[in-house]
């Protein structure tokens, strides 16, 4: 991670870490880096989620963008993937999203997309950082008629809704869909999308007030939707996070269907249609072993990357794979999109439910989700990378792997931001793997603490 940019843009507590001043500087430096070689007046799209700090940060960001001579189209409340798509659709030079995704309302963030709708490379983010922190490049500010201005785009969300509708054949008539908008960026566009696709739509958490985004709702608190699905008699529930780049589903019985299961369902359907390029799904090292077992049975390859949707996307682009994602519900359909898109994913999943004539619970049963235990070992920061060099830790992990064979696994990795080593064990018996995880955590803390 860089000095300003983390794994998903710049993030922090609004007005404390992510200030109006920093937003202005990010707008100015970002616009300069992304548009300095264009021969025309640059056009940049800006969207945001529903946080109270969004207006403040948008005003400062837009001022920075305009100061470099860019025309800025403010989309208002819009999901992150909507901004990515519309940046491509309108042939804009860049897109910017003001959002902290699934984080509490006090936080906010700023992330950029290039003209093709992809998140920026590390090199470009480092260049923006260097301009802001080191004054490494002198930005020549225009004067007179070359100063930028805000421009209007008529009904931008309608263009996104039409895009989602174009990705499936037929409609969703006959399906009752319960949606949890997390009081976030999807609160307008998600209900409209599924209504226009023909579904009977019922919605919760679609009344944002600036401080209730993600609060006990959405994909990080799916219990509310599980209850709502049962009460409303819905066929499927969809829970988005604050910026709607991820989604988790709920079946008709109120059971959660996570990102791994969604990829299993859609991946198998794409394989049947001959559309799963290389018969491969790209997942992360944190994906459930049940996905591997299902894939092996069905003749599908699973490729694993580091945790983070940017690494999933990199692998997909390098190898031509069309489906990838994370257990958390960040799922990428490279045929249609350049980033994780919860609304697109929901539409694809519902399309399989409708076309198959099966209940979501039956479709999800193709993959058995194995119990997964996650624990943290607290160690000194300078030692957290040394677990691979410790013979005792490595030997214990090897013994556990041999014990589980193909019915469990062990994964340990350092935290990127805290003095922790994260321990994950999967297996068929939850009580047993909890016991073994505690033993491993104790050994790691003794050896590296």
Swiss-Prot record:
This is Phosphoglucosamine mutase. Mg(2+) binds at residues 101, 241, 243, 245. Binds 1 Mg(2+) ion per subunit. It comes from Acetivibrio thermocellus (strain ATCC 27405 / DSM 1237 / JCM 9322 / NBRC 103400 / NCIMB 10682 / NRRL B-4536 / VPI 7372). It comes from the Bacteria. It catalyses: alpha-D-glucosamine 1-phosphate = D-glucosamine 6-phosphate. Belongs to the phosphohexose mutase family. Keywords: Isomerase, Magnesium, Metal-binding, Phosphoprotein. One of its GO terms (cellular component) is cytosol. Its cofactor is Mg(2+). InterPro entries: A-D-PHexomutase_a/b/a-I (IPR005844), A-D-PHexomutase_a/b/a-I/II/III (IPR016055), A-D-PHexomutase_a/b/a-II (IPR005845), A-D-PHexomutase_a/b/a-III (IPR005846), A-D-PHexomutase_C (IPR005843), A-D-PHexomutase_C_sf (IPR036900), A-D-PHexomutase_CS (IPR016066), Alpha-D-phosphohexomutase_SF (IPR005841). PROSITE patterns: PGM_PMM (PS00710). The active site is at 101 (phosphoserine intermediate). CDD domains: GlmM. GO terms for molecular function: magnesium ion binding; phosphoglucosamine mutase activity; phosphomannomutase activity. The modification Phosphoserine is found at residue 101. NCBIfam families: glmM, PRK10887.1. Catalyzes the conversion of glucosamine-6-phosphate to glucosamine-1-phosphate. It is an enzyme of class 5 (isomerase). GO terms for biological process: carbohydrate metabolic process; peptidoglycan biosynthetic process; UDP-N-acetylglucosamine biosynthetic process. Pfam families: PGM_PMM_I, PGM_PMM_II, PGM_PMM_III, PGM_PMM_IV.
